[in-house]
Amino acid sequence: MTNIIELPEVLANQIAAGEVVERPASVVKELVENAIDAKSSQITVEIEESGLKMIQVTDNGEGMSHEDLPLSLRRHATSKIKSQSDLFRIRTLGFRGEALPSVASISKITIKTATKEVTHGSLLIATGGEIETLEAISTPTGTKIKVENLFYNTPARLKYMKSLQAELAHIVDVVNRLSLAHPEVAFTLISDGRQLTQTSGTGDLRQAIAGIYGLNTTKKMLVISNADLDFEVSGYVSLPELTRANRNYMTILVNGRYIKNFLLNRAILDGYGSKLMVGRFPIVVIDIQIDPYLADVNVHPTKQEVRISKERELMALISTAISESLKEQDLIPDALENLAKSSTRHFSKPEQTQLPLQSRGLYYDPQKNDFFVKESAVSEKIPETDFYFGAVDNSVKVEKAELLPHSEEVIGPSSVKHASRPQNTFTETDHPNLDLKNRQKLSQMLTRLENEEQSVFPELDYFGQMHGTYLFAQGKDGLFIIDQHAAQERVKYEYYRDKIGEVDSSLQQLLVPYLFEFSGSDFINLQEKMALLNEVGIFLEVYGHNTFILREHPIWMKEEEIASGVYEMCDMLLLTNEVSIKTYRAELAIMMSCKRSIKANHSLDDYSARNLLLQLAQCQNPYNCPHGRPVLINFSKADMEKMFRRIQENHTSLRELGKY
């Protein structure tokens, strides 16, 4: 009797489903890709309970014949390849014939389909991979597939599902990627009767980007294009000022297929060069057209890993396309806009970019307890122009996005203010990059900060500054050199730590509320984590498509910090999966202290420098910044005398050494 048997087809399909169907988003991906391969121009995705209860995908594609319909549930049955040679010139998204039978084996599936050549369509109902009904019906041309009770016969998979909001965010991300890959298709995503995503299907990639990431983001995207004999590279990349805290906003498409490729990600970052801050990543949508012979998509059942021949040449092509596009842009006006934002409430741009040849110092305002740029340092008149409704400076040659038709009420400039994300204002040398995903390292840092004891700070007399970075002071113990960024980071950390920790019901009403735009998946994830934001005094309300509105802010947050501060808080939440309120408050204090501190290469006047040293002396631990770096170093009088050889290491005379 043989011990080796051929597994039943249903069991084999359930095993295959372990790789193909990881979560509800995997089902959406496979069904939508089949609809795209069927040459659909309209695809509607409807889900209930984040896809665990029901997923329905409706398209207006070619449909299936009555004879082909039952074959579609057979393993490795496909219409997309016929011979071995076809495997090397695949242009469809699917070809393995595994997805539909795998999905059918772990759910109840209902398929209605019809082709334009016949007068009637077909209905198929199957449960657990077993066909229960196959009959002729009247239905429009195209296919409608409904998947119900997903994972009903694989309870272990259900056990490891994340929350409904997290699973929904994955589905939104899948639909967004597919809509970017195929802007010629009109996508609609509906969850529990609520529309989450809708694209126009005009074929304009820029419009698709605007529909997903918002108009404000699209205005800061640059078009790129490059080609050689093997590859054609096109798409859009964000200006260096517009970045995110992770790679989730980097979309690479190969022949209409979203892929993950570390080397191509590296090529994108190389194209930006030193314009990107460490730990920040651009928003990118890059479409690569390639001969199928040069790409092997038959690597993994999910088909997200692709092996590409001449990968080094492709990397160089991408890097060159991005760097050349950035070279054409005059980035100076955006830097000046940053300066204007720090001194005026309105979002504005200067009329000209030439600055007077005089020192631009930082000064201290004791009433606001903060540093500021003296207004006389910039003598040009700055017209007040609303950020959203005003004209964009022509010196930044960025293609303007076409305004998409929107069903919502048009909001005037006097009713709300569109918040803009923080721009990169410090360098890698200011502080080590704070890795929010390294929970062990963060835990050690927070433990160290919690156990700090009160320190005694020496009395210092400030007398100068070097390179706009280091302060010089003298005390009874000798010379002290202070890192101004680390010093104010410590001062700000203890301020935010106390203020965020004692959040109460005291909120300041905003005369003009702020609007905050997010991508669909981030918008959903933030709704799930909103309680943490509420604990630190930030109350965001849903306001239209992928948008929150902020009507009030905690009294400890300065109004000029609201736009960048709230975005930074949200980005921080999105990077952490599970975090306690105590930990979030502590991490938030570290992040905000660094973002709000003066940076290197900024001159301080004498009053501001002395005031910084006074604030530092009042800190619980004035000797280290929150990251653990030293705030100051000391050269004693004896150290100085040794360096200048005013005293010898020992008492041996020069005559005894034979010098004289």
UniProtKB/Swiss-Prot annotation:
GO molecular function, one term: ATP hydrolysis activity
UniProt entry tagged with the keyword Zinc: no
InterPro entries with a match to the protein in the record: DNA_mismatch_repair_CS (IPR014762), DNA_mismatch_repair_MutL (IPR020667), DNA_mismatch_S5_2-like (IPR013507), HATPase_C_sf (IPR036890), MutL/Mlh/PMS (IPR002099), MutL/Mlh/Pms-like (IPR038973), MutL_C (IPR014790), MutL_C_dimsub (IPR042120)
Keywords: DNA damage, DNA repair
Gene Ontology cellular-component annotations: mismatch repair complex
A GO biological process held by the record: mismatch repair
CDD domains attached to this UniProt entry: HATPase_MutL-MLH-PMS-like (cd16926), MutL_Trans (cd00782)
Entry-linked HAMAP family: DNA_mis_repair
PANTHER family membership: DNA MISMATCH REPAIR PROTEIN MLH, PMS, MUTL, DNA MISMATCH REPAIR PROTEIN MLH1
Family statement: Belongs to the DNA mismatch repair MutL/HexB family.
Function in brief: This protein is involved in the repair of mismatches in DNA. It is required for dam-dependent methyl-directed DNA mismatch repair. May act as a 'molecular matchmaker', a protein that promotes the formation of a stable complex between two or more DNA-binding proteins in an ATP-dependent manner without itself being part of a final effector complex.
Protein name: DNA mismatch repair protein MutL
Species: Streptococcus pyogenes serotype M18 (strain MGAS8232)
Protein encoded by which gene: mutL
